[in-house]
Amino acid sequence: MWYRTFRTLGYTICRPYATCATKAERFVKTIDPSTLPRGYLVSSTYAGIKNAIRPVTSTNEPSAATTNVPHPQEAPKPDVALIVSSVPAAIAGTFTTNVFKAAPVVHATTALKAAGPNARVRAILTNSGCANAVTGQQGLEDTQTLVNRVQALLSPRNQNAIPTYEQDARSSSTDVLMMSTGVIGVRLPVAHIQRCLEHLAAPSILQSHPDAWLEAARAYMTTDTFPKIRTRQFILGNRRCSIVGIDKGAGMIHPRMTRSGGQLHATLLGVFATDAPISSATLQRCLDEAVRVSFNCISVDGDMSTNDTILALANGQAPFVDLDCTDTPNEWTETEHPDMVNKFAEELKSLCIEMSHLIVRDGEGAEKFVQVHVRNAGTYEQAHAIASSISTSALVKCAMHGEDANWGRILCSAGYASLPASTPAWTLDPSKVNVTFLPPPHQPDDLAPLPTLVNGVPQAVNETQAKKLLSYEDIYVDVDLQGGSWGSQGRSEATYWTCDFSKEYITVRW
Amino acid sequence: MWYRTFRTLGYTICRPYATCATKAERFVKTIDPSTLPRGYLVSSTYAGIKNAIRPVTSTNEPSAATTNVPHPQEAPKPDVALIVSSVPAAIAGTFTTNVFKAAPVVHATTALKAAGPNARVRAILTNSGCANAVTGQQGLEDTQTLVNRVQALLSPRNQNAIPTYEQDARSSSTDVLMMSTGVIGVRLPVAHIQRCLEHLAAPSILQSHPDAWLEAARAYMTTDTFPKIRTRQFILGNRRCSIVGIDKGAGMIHPRMTRSGGQLHATLLGVFATDAPISSATLQRCLDEAVRVSFNCISVDGDMSTNDTILALANGQAPFVDLDCTDTPNEWTETEHPDMVNKFAEELKSLCIEMSHLIVRDGEGAEKFVQVHVRNAGTYEQAHAIASSISTSALVKCAMHGEDANWGRILCSAGYASLPASTPAWTLDPSKVNVTFLPPPHQPDDLAPLPTLVNGVPQAVNETQAKKLLSYEDIYVDVDLQGGSWGSQGRSEATYWTCDFSKEYITVRW
């Protein structure tokens, strides 16, 4: 089977990266079919989007159209995926705050707003290759055309519709959403995608098998070097609940057209589908919190996309553990089932963090995975701002690439962070700052933490230990502000994840 | 003479950079002695600071101490410079807003605050090689020790003091300031610097010759590839006024010790000395405005240093044009001499802009000089925030390096700029944005502007023209927001200057 052709090497976090296998070999894991959520079917195919679109140019080089055609004997990577819930699912979403929102983002946010707290969706259509961004009114119409077509195909009036579909009074016309990633400023090749939709929505094509999920994850990929998919399973009350997460990392979509005319674009897309019975409003709050400490805490190059979207679906199809007792309520809400919701929120958060790390690990040119933990700040927002400033500093990222325990650059970037206001005002106290490099968990060398700055005073550094610590692929930086101007009242912390800046990044991003 | 050994090639801005001479050959210009301000003397020498300091390590490699010793036949670059005014000069300063301010920054800001609006200085002592940052109370004491020593040497009670010195009742004990740049977290080698001071302050060593000024500019350099010095001369009323500016660009100070232990650091230092008669308070306002639109509008790598300092001195020694009419007031102030002050402010601003550009051109690994002009925003601060966001985007900087007219990345980075609030609120309107690449001034190819986005709609791009425009060393990006949500009321503009991101940057910053 395709997904088994990746060797799962049992990646050891503390092995020096230079000796490791490819990222695909290390980070693609076999999916246990029993951990996939119930009531979802997926399909994906190759629509030829990259070849269909041309950048807006006045000259067309003859070779441009054929550049991305794969070798005849090589199956092209799928670029369209459909995820269908057998019943209308509760839906939640978080979207880019970029002013220039792509058409699918505008469509989804408008649809969710119109649908209100009981919003339901039946399907998520995703394409890679074209972001449908900066495409104006035409872009919105293109998204709507495709969404309408999927809705019609999944409608119970369509005699070919998937048999498990159940009519639900709550479902509305907003029940298909779309996500796009790829080249911006170019119209979506609607005809190319449209002619795949009947195939994608056919009952014989929609599958619940791990192969189908992995292929869907591949359809999301742009310059990602591996498909990103993980599952979680847990017992909640009398239900065995599962979540599957797919995401894709920041990546250049048009590697052969990087010169003028090719509009490269990086986007974060993610979808989390669960069979837990959660209301839309509750799911939204769980997702907000999960994204706040996962996807909103990663950085590859500091550039926020026009298309960033994370969607979560909950269809309530989780099986009962004790079949004699099936009187679980239809949907859990925070007020009525706080324990269930809290446990679900923790599981979703944990999965979001794991999935966000995969994006950092697959960051363009990334050779290091760096965790920046800022402790004992005034507020979470202040700790987050400082961790973000450190994690996006080009100088820090170059130092990590060079395996240099450079506390000076860390301190400097912490010092110019733009701090959100708080009452009372909170400030960093230079004489209280500790910067320590921590050994990665489970490292075999039994290294001790390496303090480089204690109470604002530079420390004598054991060069041998520093060299060893920084040679790991995973670097853990601990910044303890000891409460700053609030003293013992300053106890907030935030964790950020970033990668290093390598020459490879410049090459990829030319 | 040393400064004439650089060929001044009459740099043509539109020549493709690949065919150009070195940056030193292109950007070091001969100084006309008659354009230097009156009443200033300078000296510089090699104190061996880089060799004197050792990073805080537990192991000392034998080779470390000798790494930076120059070839015996090669004169070492000076690393200490003294600029002395023959009379106490009005003083103004702008300093880094980084929380972790270096000792000389704390010393200077404290001294200027204590001295009040009539602050006067006699001398500026500058060293490169050691930033005296993150050195705590000891660092402050070290700065004070050196400042005290220079004061004693320049005191009229010292019989060797320079003969032109005139006692001034207004001068106070705060009349020597210091600037430092280099390695951080390491104590200043006070003894090494101190033993040079008598030499530096000796009347036979202090000079007003262009050679002496150029050597002082060299003393400021860290990884700068050329000394940065320019002059301005202009008639104000009955006075022929001059300004000389020296600055140094962001640079790694310890290229041989970039691995753990070496704490690399980038700093912007600048000094502007004029013989115009300007009061300290007025000089401060002129400097604030000049820095706001020059040094605060450049970016090399987006990292703000702990040592950034710009100082301005005005000693009132400008010669009279008409010697029969010498009744000019002692000092010009904004309220009493607005025309004089406005003209002076324009000259200072123009010089600051020129000097700030030299830093961008000498940016580490920089091969392109990029001007980002944002027009028709709500407020200056909003235009500045958008221009800054575009100029610090790694993706935009990579695109400029790759000579890619990538309006998508420009738009995207404009879209996530963190906008300062205004009343009423102002927002970007995606349907009004124009992005145009402009031909550099005086380019011989007579190229037309290249609109890539008009009213938010991507334009067909003439590939040949785009290729030509982007092949220039200087790239001009014009972003017209057409007033955004304020319509015709949105008329503010800001200009930012940045460089590209090259593989060379990663190499330098390892």
Curated annotation (Swiss-Prot), chains A, B:
GO BP terms in the entry: L-arginine biosynthetic process; ornithine biosynthetic process
GO molecular function, one term: L-glutamate N-acetyltransferase activity
Site (Involved in the stabilization of negative charge on the oxyanion by the formation of the oxyanion hole): T181, G182
Record key words, sorted: Acyltransferase, Amino-acid biosynthesis, Arginine biosynthesis, Autocatalytic cleavage, Mitochondrion, Multifunctional enzyme, Transferase
Region (Disordered): 57-76
This protein's record includes keyword Transmembrane: no
Post-translational modification as stated in the protein's UniProt record: The alpha and beta chains are autoproteolytically processed from a single precursor protein within the mitochondrion.
Enzyme Commission (EC) number: 2.3.1.35, 2.3.1.1
Compositionally skewed regions (Polar residues) per UniProt: 57-70
Coiled coil stretches, renumbered: none
Family matches, as InterPro entries: Arg_biosynth_ArgJ, ArgJ-like_dom_sf, ArgJ_beta_C
Further remark: This protein may be expected to contain an N-terminal transit peptide but none has been predicted.
Family: Belongs to the ArgJ family.
Name listed for the protein in its UniProt record: Arginine biosynthesis bifunctional protein ArgJ, mitochondrial
Taxonomic source organism: Malassezia globosa (strain ATCC MYA-4612 / CBS 7966)
